[in-house]
């Protein structure tokens, strides 16, 4: 390192010992951050789903509405048996969660666009959808930090939506939004369980 002037920064750089590039990164901190965010997200998932349903009209807004049979091929389901879930390795657990929240960020953007057209006068719903998308993106970043700390490869980002039929009817768009907001809640619940397990395993 060449220093033409004896500036304070230059002198400081000469006095400080070099950083070791091989210093291990503890996963406990990013796991704790991700767990805290997932818990915060979990507190808001039911409100998001109920707000969404209330703005779609019948049958969505009818008391007790539920359609678990509705699924999207572009969005992985969070449903998994306890035995299968508990037997997962860390890499698989994190990879599946990251893939799901990547898909959710893209689907929440689509649902937000749909609702801007279907319910332009509903700022609360649009704000909640936008906040959910940003939190999902934040959790994605936390997941990537955990995988880096554990020395695991980070899956490349993919276009999970593919080609979206722009001619979808209003009812089809409402169904799509219902599935996305429902699965957002289910995946958040699963992420809390995933991260609680990792938190106990890698506690500082």
UniProtKB/Swiss-Prot annotation:
Record's keyword annotation contains Glycoprotein: yes
A GO cellular component entry from the record: extracellular space
Record flagged with keyword Glycoprotein: yes
Superkingdom assignment: Eukaryota
Keywords: Cytokine, Developmental protein, Glycoprotein, Secreted, Signal
Gene Ontology molecular function, alphabetical: ciliary neurotrophic factor receptor binding; cytokine activity; leukemia inhibitory factor receptor binding
Main location: secreted
GO biological process: one example: cell population proliferation
Gene3D superfamilies noted in UniProt: 1.20.1250.10
Signal peptide feature range: 1-22
Tissues expressed in: Not detected in adult tissues.
Subcellular location: Secreted
InterPro entries noted in UniProt: 4_helix_cytokine-like_core, PRF/CT
Glycan-bearing residues: 44
Family label: Belongs to the IL-6 superfamily.
Functional note: Increases the platelet count associated with splenomegaly. May have an important role in neuronal precursor development and maturation.
Subunit structure: Binds to tripartite CNTF receptor complex consisting of CNTF alpha chain, LIFR and IL6ST (in vitro).
Protein name: Cardiotrophin-2
Organism of provenance: Mus musculus
Phylogenetic lineage: Eukaryota, Metazoa, Chordata, Craniata, Vertebrata
